[in-house]
Amino acid sequence: MPFLSSLEGVFGYGRPQTQTAVVEFNYPNFSSTAGLVEVSTAGVISNLLYITDTTGGDVGNVYRSTAIQYNRSFSFEWNFECSGGTSPPADGFCLQWTPTNNTNGGGGGSVGYLTTAVQAFTFLTYINNSFTWYKNNVIQTNVTGQNFYQNLFYWADYNHTTSTMRIYVSTTNTKPASANFTLTGLSFDSGNYYIGFGAATGGSTENHILRSMKLTFT
């Protein structure tokens, strides 16, 4: 630790205070699943987490093993691949914040979503190809005409002060300059929640592959 020789060095007098970003977790791949709870997933294959494979009528979920507070600004990034299966493929995946981490969400077009989630996003691939934001099981935003049936990189930047979430999507690991979805009025209370993903197939199928994820409090 560097020696601090003045009150300015100790307390930061005379200079602006900055918030240090803190990485809560980082999975560049899933060679290790320590800190995760898997519920009926297809397991890890070649260091990638298959939430489902192309089995019909399947549903899987994965959660962090520890519930924490999200009433602070953060950036969550993940790489998710939907591939293989039938034509048309189905059904997609969800990202959600839940009070529990030991159950599967709904199958088919519910894509593993838990109705108890305080915040959730679904990314559907079957026919409707839509993005939907749910808050306490009530639809807030629905955007059709999307294409999540590919290997995509995602960033979700949450500003707690302005109650705004901006979601960016790209086919490369370079974050776009502009957000694909800007969600206003999105906020977290002081409760502790598990962040997690769900995915499901129905009569039509696809692989739902979580390739990486990282959470940084900003």
Each model region followed by its residue ranges:
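N-terminal low-complexity, intrinsically disordered "leader/linker" segments enriched in small/polar
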Residues: 1-20
